Structure formats: structure tokens, C-alpha cells
Regions:
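Proline-enriched interdomain boundary motifs that mark the N-terminal boundary
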Residues: 1-3, 118-128
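N-terminal Sec-dependent signal peptide, specifically the hydrophobic helical h-region
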Residues: 1-13, 235-238
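Solvent-exposed loop/turn motifs of extracellular immunoglobulin-like beta-sandwich domains
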Residues: 9-17, 28-31, 73-77, 83-95, ...
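N-terminal V-set
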Residues: 17, 22-64, 146-167, 196
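Beta-sandwich strand segments
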Residues: 27-29, 102-109, 207-212
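Interdomain boundary/hinge segments at the C-termini of tandem beta-sandwich modules
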Residues: 38, 112-118, 212-219
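Type I single-pass or GPI-anchored cell-surface glycoprotein architecture
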Residues: 60-61, 100, 192, 198-206, ...
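Ligand-binding face of N-terminal immunoglobulin V-set domains in extracellular IgSF glycoproteins
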Residues: 63-113
Length: 238
């Protein structure tokens, strides 16, 4: 049976995808065949074949980025060390270990789901401007995050969520494969408006919130909080 595991890594970091037999195991590197590949596309990540030192069949995206430890393999640890994680690495990886002396019987099969994350920049909220006498427009920008964010606008007076129908979000992938987001909020003009823009990264369970007040060119102090928007409030906004 194939074991299933999950692991999370930040963009640019190194991560270990675990594939190991119970402690105390011993293996002969001339007997075991080890294959790491992506589960869906079957892209070759790395492998170990006895008396075959060349890794010419490794996909170029993983060459020199994916390694197993020979010393670890002797102990039954066939884990994969993946360096410099990218957003494109977010997928399922399959580890398969076979024994030649056992008639190429499967010794170990593990599927590891890698979740990739990157922190969004602290949002920048533009000073409000008035396209008309009875309307105010705010713009909130945040870049270089992963996965795709949720964007909320908040009435800072009572911390209630503004109707999402009032905002227009543009989210796109940049050259690094990370997400940039621009949200434009249009609200009716009132004598005093105190609003905040919240960028939520669900995978990191992190929200970045910046406020803006009418008459102020500088936003309130930036802050990072863990889930300041309650589930009930979110549901009410959708």
C-alpha cells in the first residue's frame, strides 16, 4: 500500500520529502532501485539504480535540485531533499523502492503532497480620491505571495466586513510564478471613513491588514495577525 503524507515549504527554502522504512532497516545499495517522480505527469525527479551513477534521465527542472543521501539509503531512508522550492513544485511526488533480490518486489511506496507558500508584501493602500462628488475610491496592492490570496475590505470603526460587491480584485501571476493582487474599493462618500485592506494567505493562516482614513495620506501602522476575520464574518461576506 502507498503511504500518503503532506508537507509545506516556503518559496526559496529547502524541504525534505519523507520516504523511509522503519528504524533499524538495512539495505544494500547494489540491491535497491529507488525512483522519485511526480505523481500526475510522471516527471523524473531523481533515482538510484545500482552500478548506474548517471542521472541523465532526471528532468531539467530537478537536476541538481533533488538529492537522496547514500548514507541514508543504507539505513532505509530514501527521503528526497529538494532545494530552492518554487511555486511549480506544488504537486504530489511519488517515492518507489524495489528490491532486486526479492524479484523486484515493492519494498516501499510513499506519495508526498508538497504545499508551497510565500508571504505577501504588506499591503499598500492609496490615499482615497474622488472620481465624483458622492464616491470615494481606495486601491490596495500586495505582491509576491502564494497561493492565491483572499482580499477583504474592513470598516475599521466596528471591524465589520464591507460588501465584496463594492470591490474589484485583479489577481495575476508575475514572472516569478507568484501572485500580485490589486483591489479597488468604491464606496459612497461620508464625512469620515476609516477602512482597512486585508490580504489573507489561507495556507499560512496569516492576514496582513493596513488601514486608511479620509484626510490621511499615511495608512495606519501595518500589522500582521492570525485570522483576525472570524469564520462567521467571512461567511457573511460571501
Amino acid at each position: 500500500d502507498t503511504q500518503e503524507k503532506e508537507v509545506r515549504a516556503m518559496v526559496g527554502s529547502d524541504v525534505e520529502l519523507s520516504c523511509a522504512c522503519p528504524e533499524g532497516s538495512r539495505f544494500d545499495l547494489n540491491d535497491v532501485y529507488v525512483y522519485w517522480q511526480t505523481s500526475e505527469s510522471k516527471t523524473v525527479v531523481t533515482y538510484h539504480i545500482p552500478q548506474h551513477s548517471s542521472l541523465e534521465n532526471v528532468d531539467s527542472r530537478y537536476r541538481n535540485r533533488a538529492l537522496m543521501s547514500p548514507a541514508g539509503m543504507l539505513r532505509g531512508d530514501f527521503s528526497l531533499r529538494l532545494f530552492n522550492v518554487t511555486p511549480q513544485d506544488e504537486q504530489k511526488f511519488h517515492c518507489l523502492v524495489l528490491s532486486r533480490s526479492l524479484g523486484f518486489q515493492e519494498v516501499l511506496s510513499v506519495e508526498v503532497t508538497l504545499h508551497v507558500a510565500a508571504n505577501f508584501s504588506v499591503p499598500v493602500v492609496s490615499a482615497p480620491h474622488s472620481p465624483s462628488q458622492d464616491e470615494l475610491t481606495f486601491t490596495c496592492t500586495s505582491i509576491n505571495g502564494y497561493p492565491r490570496p483572499n482580499v477583504y475590505w474592513i470598516n475599521k470603526t466596528d471591524n465589520s466586513l464591507l460588501d465584496q460587491a463594492l470591490q474589484n480584485d485583479t489577481v495575476f501571476l508575475n514572472m516569478r510564478g507568484l501572485y500580485d493582487v490589486v483591489s479597488v474599493l468604491r464606496i459612497a462618500r461620508t464625512p469620515s471613513v476609516n477602512i482597512g485592506c486585508c490580504i489573507e494567505n489561507v495556507l499560512l493562516q496569516q492576514n496582513l491588514t493596513v488601514g486608511s482614513q479620509t484626510g490621511n495620506d499615511i495608512g495606519e501602522r501595518d500589522k500582521i495577525t492570525e485570522n483576525p476575520v472570524s469564520t462567521g464574518e467571512k461567511n457573511a461576506a460571501t
